[in-house]
Amino acid sequence: LANDADCFVLSEATDGAGAGANSVFGVILGTGVGGGLFLNGHLLQGPNGIAGEWGHNPLPWRRAEDGAVQRCYCGLDDCIETFISGPGWSQRSNLGLAAGQIAQAARQSEPAAKDALERYCDQLARALASVINLIDPQVIVLGGGLSNIPELYPQVSNSLLQYVFSDQLNTRLLPARHGDSSGVRGAAWLGAGLLLNH
């Protein structure tokens, strides 16, 4: 069986935003944070079935402005999910707004919301840089509700280079081509028995 992030990356790597790339990391940013990995034409699941699940690693390069240590539902402290999921961002922003409302307020030049969006983009860049430093994917595809915030793409892309262990960054950060349909599409690809590699 595959989870939603695995199905998402399978769809986007097969004929979506990551089509034609040898390595695609798919990210779902929503109520939770999920990741899936597609390498050399195959969905990578690993012996534990958790390949790509980087949301329960600690946020890299922690800073004072990231706020107090927070316990994740998994029992660990400061998991990436507690920062960059919708509920995590909302709670840590201390604005009393849902994630989409924070983005909207930032677009309207509300200072605290602009700061919260900038901090979120930096945290997402740090989280993705850790993936780039480990697997160096050609493409990272973002899906889930928060992936619809257009400001993420230029801001995160601009922040990535300061955390990636390289003088250049060729990894492309892209929105999902198939949007909310990617998970269902990936499940269909999986159900057809295509491309799965245990």
Where in the sequence are the language-model features?
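A generic "binding-loop/recognition-motif" signal
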Residues: 5-6, 50, 180
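ATP-dependent carbohydrate kinase catalytic cores
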Residues: 1-13, 17-19, 25-27
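Glycine-rich phosphate-binding loop of actin/hexokinase-like ATP-binding domains
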Residues: 19-81
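Short, glycine/serine-rich, charged loops/turns that create anion-binding
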Residues: 6, 42, 146-147
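Active-site glycine-centered loops adjacent to acidic/histidine catalytic or metal-binding residues
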Residues: 4, 30, 187
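Hydrophobic residues at beta-strand termini and immediately following loops
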Residues: 2, 57, 176
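ATP-binding/phosphotransfer module of carbohydrate and carboxylate kinases, centering on a glycine-rich
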Residues: 11-21, 61-198
